[in-house]
């Protein structure tokens, strides 16, 4: 586990973004942990979050020309990641995001920000079913751009309805790499370092045995 990954887990725990317990997911599964990136909701939170996204993007080595944040959750993530890449990595890259409803006045259209072109890095909080990615791909393709990769905060490394995870399906369907700040593997490694979290570690391991990929 890299230093920034450990720091991100501690950041998520401190903001109650990452919680342990029993949580019913949309799939109906009872998960021993829950991740809600919407609780990164202050200026300092966003500044830090952008730095973690930027660190993981640079660390991945994936080349891209533009950051795209799908509405709504992807919008602040793309914005803060773009700022962090410029401030901390000297990479001043364009970014844009889509509107849910296209405007018919002013500048018009369904996109805000830089023109959507070149190799696009799509940034979001998590991938659950991959629906948002598919919607974004339609927008990216319509503008003649290509998908360089997808960047999320947490990869749950969990099977969907079939044998693959939603992330593996995205990688297969769009021939792109999905990057995450952390995966379930790092989360388990972190829990294993903390004797006081032994009960949570056992629960998460049992869940991985049942639903992991």
Curated annotation (Swiss-Prot):
<dbReference type="GO" id="GO:0000287">
    <property type="term" value="F:magnesium ion binding"/>
</dbReference>
<dbReference type="InterPro" id="IPR004467">
    <property type="entry name" value="Or_phspho_trans_dom"/>
</dbReference>
<dbReference type="InterPro" id="IPR023031">
    <property type="entry name" value="OPRT"/>
</dbReference>
<dbReference type="GO" id="GO:0044205">
    <property type="term" value="P:'de novo' UMP biosynthetic process"/>
</dbReference>
<keyword id="KW-0665">Pyrimidine biosynthesis</keyword>
<keyword id="KW-0460">Magnesium</keyword>
<keyword id="KW-0328">Glycosyltransferase</keyword>
<comment type="subunit">
    <text>Homodimer.</text>
</comment>
<keyword id="KW-0808">Transferase</keyword>
<protein>
    <recommendedName>
        <fullName>Orotate phosphoribosyltransferase</fullName>
        <ecNumber>2.4.2.10</ecNumber>
    </recommendedName>
</protein>
<comment type="pathway">
    <text>Pyrimidine metabolism; UMP biosynthesis via de novo pathway; UMP from orotate: step 1/2.</text>
</comment>
<feature type="binding site">
    <location>
        <position position="156"/>
    </location>
    <ligand>
        <name>orotate</name>
    </ligand>
</feature>
<comment type="similarity">
    <text>Belongs to the purine/pyrimidine phosphoribosyltransferase family. PyrE subfamily.</text>
</comment>
<feature type="binding site">
    <location>
        <position position="103"/>
    </location>
    <ligand>
        <name>5-phospho-alpha-D-ribose 1-diphosphate</name>
    </ligand>
</feature>
<dbReference type="InterPro" id="IPR029057">
    <property type="entry name" value="PRTase-like"/>
</dbReference>
<feature type="binding site" description="in other chain">
    <location>
        <begin position="72"/>
        <end position="73"/>
    </location>
    <ligand>
        <name>5-phospho-alpha-D-ribose 1-diphosphate</name>
    </ligand>
</feature>
<feature type="binding site">
    <location>
        <position position="99"/>
    </location>
    <ligand>
        <name>5-phospho-alpha-D-ribose 1-diphosphate</name>
    </ligand>
</feature>
<dbReference type="GO" id="GO:0046132">
    <property type="term" value="P:pyrimidine ribonucleoside biosynthetic process"/>
</dbReference>
<dbReference type="GO" id="GO:0006207">
    <property type="term" value="P:'de novo' pyrimidine nucleobase biosynthetic process"/>
</dbReference>
<feature type="binding site">
    <location>
        <begin position="34"/>
        <end position="35"/>
    </location>
    <ligand>
        <name>orotate</name>
    </ligand>
</feature>
<feature type="binding site" description="in other chain">
    <location>
        <position position="100"/>
    </location>
    <ligand>
        <name>5-phospho-alpha-D-ribose 1-diphosphate</name>
    </ligand>
</feature>
<feature type="binding site" description="in other chain">
    <location>
        <begin position="124"/>
        <end position="132"/>
    </location>
    <ligand>
        <name>5-phospho-alpha-D-ribose 1-diphosphate</name>
    </ligand>
</feature>
<dbReference type="GO" id="GO:0004588">
    <property type="term" value="F:orotate phosphoribosyltransferase activity"/>
</dbReference>
<comment type="function">
    <text>Catalyzes the transfer of a ribosyl phosphate group from 5-phosphoribose 1-diphosphate to orotate, leading to the formation of orotidine monophosphate (OMP).</text>
</comment>
<dbReference type="GO" id="GO:0005737">
    <property type="term" value="C:cytoplasm"/>
</dbReference>
<feature type="binding site" description="in other chain">
    <location>
        <position position="26"/>
    </location>
    <ligand>
        <name>5-phospho-alpha-D-ribose 1-diphosphate</name>
    </ligand>
</feature>
<dbReference type="Pfam" id="PF00156">
    <property type="entry name" value="Pribosyltran"/>
</dbReference>
<feature type="binding site">
    <location>
        <position position="105"/>
    </location>
    <ligand>
        <name>5-phospho-alpha-D-ribose 1-diphosphate</name>
    </ligand>
</feature>
<dbReference type="InterPro" id="IPR000836">
    <property type="entry name" value="PRibTrfase_dom"/>
</dbReference>
<feature type="binding site">
    <location>
        <position position="128"/>
    </location>
    <ligand>
        <name>orotate</name>
    </ligand>
</feature>
């Amino acid at each position: 586990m890299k230093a920034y990954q450990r720091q991100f887990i501690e950041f998520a725990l401190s903001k109650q973004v990452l919680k342990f317990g029993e949580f019913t997911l949309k799939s109906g599964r009872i998960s021993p942990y829950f991740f809600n990136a919407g609780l990164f909701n202050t200026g300092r939170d966003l500044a830090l979050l952008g730095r973690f996204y930027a660190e993981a993007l640079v660390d991945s080595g994936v080349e891209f020309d533009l950051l795209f944040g799908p509405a709504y959750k992807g919008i602040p993530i793309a914005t803060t990641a773009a700022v962090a890449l410029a401030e901390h990595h000297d990479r001043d890259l364009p970014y844009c995001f889509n509107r849910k409803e296209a405007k018919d006045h002013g500048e018009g259209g369904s996109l805000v920000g830089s023109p959507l072109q070149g190799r696009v890095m799509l940034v979001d909080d998590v991938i659950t079913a991959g629906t948002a990615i598919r919607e974004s791909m339609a927008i990216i393709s319509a503008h003649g751009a290509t998908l360089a990769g997808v960047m999320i905060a947490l990869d749950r490394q969990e099977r969907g309805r079939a044998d693959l995870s939603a992330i593996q399906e995205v990688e297969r369907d769009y021939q792109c790499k999905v990057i995450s700040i952390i995966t379930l593997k790092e989360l388990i490694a972190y829990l294993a370092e903390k004797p006081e979290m032994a009960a949570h570690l056992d629960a998460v391991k049992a869940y991985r045995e049942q639903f992991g990929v």
